[in-house]
Amino acid sequence: MLKFIIPTIMLMPLTWLSKNNLIWINSTAHSLLISFSSLLLLNQLNDNSLNYSLMFFSDPLSTPLLILTMWLLPLMLMASQSHLIKEPPVRKKLYITMLITLQALLIMTFTATELILFYIMFEATLIPTLIIITRWGNQTERLNAGLYFLFYTLVGSLPLLVALVYLQNTTGSLNFLLLQHWAQPLSTSWSNIFMWLACMMAFLVKMPLYGLYLWLPKAHVEAPIAGSMVLAAVLLKLGGYGMLRITSMLNPLTEHMAYPFLMLSLWGMIMTSSICLRQTDLKSLIAYSSVSHMALVIAAILIQTPWSYMGATALMIAHGLTSSMLFCLANSNYERIHSRTMILPGGLQVFLPLMASWWLLASLTNLALPPTINLIGELLVVMSVFSWSNPTILLMGTNIVITALYSLYMLIMTQRGKHTHHINNITPSFTREHALMALHIIPLLLLSLNPKIILGPLY
């Protein structure tokens, strides 16, 4: 595992020692090398996990998320270049250092064997993200967003620490690999119920569950582009990853406890999709669509069948790439028009035809068009939820229709219609932006050809 962690950390001296005109070239090129080398992890055998040491391991659940994390760093660097163009070199280097720190922490989060190490890294990812949001965000509202983000996640995850200390005292170890074999079946006593809640709350806030999601649209809207990308693509997946890891230790209590949360997420899925139809703010719409997609993942994980686990992992990876791409597209609009309102850039298709085709591709993957990986994930989740309880097909069907509606609404509002005069002298799109979109969509299309590599450990 060190072959990814050490090069990532060594990107920092590289950035600080680069000449001012080579900062972006060096950091992007070398982070791309790291992300290409991480693809070798897909080569491992499906039936077992790789134990690198006592600290780190990877199995078919964490490997796709690891690769997604490493794949995103060069993309974030590519996306951030134009909005940092007026900053002094020291600030650019600081910004890149924050992103690199975040990637190193995320790699350690996804490969930790020890629950306490996982918890520390899980919490540590807050710090760089918070700095990125509150320092480089666009409006002054960003401080409020940072506060929401910090307090929601901290209050949610403090009980988890208490639960972990309790687990350590009762079982003597917090190793993932051992606990799965040692865990005593939990009875339905009040103390166990509270422990279950303590374990799950941190991840449900991070996902986020309907009702605990208020920090997400705020953080997304105020964050700079790299903040939005990493938040949508990887930080939300931390919640799903943690839930997948920890539910195996909390059986058979989960079967008793899951009902209210299942209902909440199935209902919240429709509510947040409906909120999307009323949005005027482009970034806010994409943020709410993230909430509704993640609600599907929560439902899938709480049902705990092999099918739903496979659907959850596929949906997490697919959503990571898709929402990140949508944020990049929204950002390229924002840099030209300097507004996130969807009505203003109407008719952009005439001016930026290639960008319009990226918009079309991104919207179609977001609404889970066959044969994309999004559809595979959604189908697996819908089938497993349907076999758990038949009436849920009404909720699921409604959600799929609303998702299609708001995706097409977003596409039509930004690309079609009559263009207004204020976008007549718009700057053309850069090759850098097209490369960025291509690097998002190519993995999605390739995964559609071979989805089995991201279906998790139960495939």
From Swiss-Prot:
List the subcellular locations.
Mitochondrion inner membrane
Q: Which organism is it from?
A: Balaenoptera physalus (Fin whale)
The GO biological-process annotations, alphabetized, read as: electron transport coupled proton transport; mitochondrial electron transport, NADH to ubiquinone; mitochondrial respiratory chain complex I assembly
Task: Show the stretches that span the lipid bilayer.
Answer: 22-42, 60-80, 92-112, 113-133, 147-167, 193-213, 224-244, 257-277, 284-303, 308-330, 342-362, 393-413, 435-455
Which enzyme class, named as a word? translocase
User: What's the stated role of this polypeptide?
Assistant: Core subunit of the mitochondrial membrane respiratory chain NADH dehydrogenase (Complex I) which catalyzes electron transfer from NADH through the respiratory chain, using ubiquinone as an electron acceptor. Essential for the catalytic activity and assembly of complex I.
InterPro entries attached to this UniProt entry: NADH4_N (IPR000260), NADH_Q_OxRdtase_chainM/4 (IPR010227), NADH_UbQ_OxRdtase (IPR003918), ND/Mrp_TM (IPR001750)
Q: Name one GO cellular component term.
A: mitochondrial inner membrane
User: Which reaction is recorded as catalysed by this protein?
Assistant: a ubiquinone + NADH + 5 H(+)(in) = a ubiquinol + NAD(+) + 4 H(+)(out)
What EC number is given for this enzyme? Answer: 7.1.1.2
- Its name, as the record gives it, is NADH-ubiquinone oxidoreductase chain 4
Q: Which domain of life is it from?
A: Eukaryota
Q: Which UniProt keywords apply?
A: Electron transport, Membrane, Mitochondrion, Mitochondrion inner membrane, NAD, Respiratory chain, Translocase, Transmembrane, Transmembrane helix, Transport, Ubiquinone
Q: How does it assemble?
A: Core subunit of respiratory chain NADH dehydrogenase (Complex I) which is composed of 45 different subunits.
Q: Which family does it belong to?
A: Belongs to the complex I subunit 4 family.
Alphabetically, the GO molecular function entries are: NADH dehydrogenase (ubiquinone) activity; ubiquinone binding
Please report a single Pfam family linked to this protein: Proton_antipo_M
Lineage per the UniProt record: Eukaryota, Metazoa, Chordata, Craniata, Vertebrata
Q: How does it sit in the membrane?
A: Multi-pass membrane protein
